């Protein structure tokens, strides 16, 4: 048996490794045999591997829910309860920086909402009021880099007309939205994601022409109207979307189980990636490696490896079947 020098060069108390994430590093002297034991148990820190968590809040549809579920991308498995939104609602949009998650808009089940909430992702608890959208609006799309978050499109409460409005907030502050520009096509239940420089908004429902297959993009650090990027293979709404720094992934929709992807830095039509296990609308959040999908009406969570192609596999379960807008502290807009 190898000799064990368990201890810390500063403290006499032993500090044992307990996670694969880099931030869990424990100071001390360990034999190679002990390192192998810790690594086999998933407890030896890996340089460069950061803790990444995802969150799903509210509901996808026009029913009200205030639940916030949290998942761990490193360990995978079932979600845990994080806290509650300030107002119970569905059809909300979400985005995040590396430290703060934001959700806005939606429908309470009886009234439209312009409320924007935020959480500090490292600390479980209920959401806090951030500010307001320019108008009460349901089913906008959300996207962000580490500085700005965008709300794009949605349904106007007064006329039920689809909106082409893009608004933004500075995530590290609080306050009401500011006008950014317009989408090329007015829509609700579109979805958003992107890189640190580009924000994509795609698909969604148009009151006059049904669902849309249009993909738009904007340069997130500036302001102005969106530009056409390309098309999905079919028109649909309620698509789950997320990205790493290179690829944007779109999965499902109201009547399809198709997963498609685009390369964010280019333009063009979407390419087939694989299939999710159900044909349904859903939400998505991502780390640099993994895209995770959840669906209203089901507590099943599925995953794919973003850099490859193929069908989704099981990740775990959420605490409820609500599973509204998804965000994370490791998505492609943050690098």
Task: Identify the role of each PLM range.
Residues 1-335:
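Polar, enzyme-active/binding microenvironments
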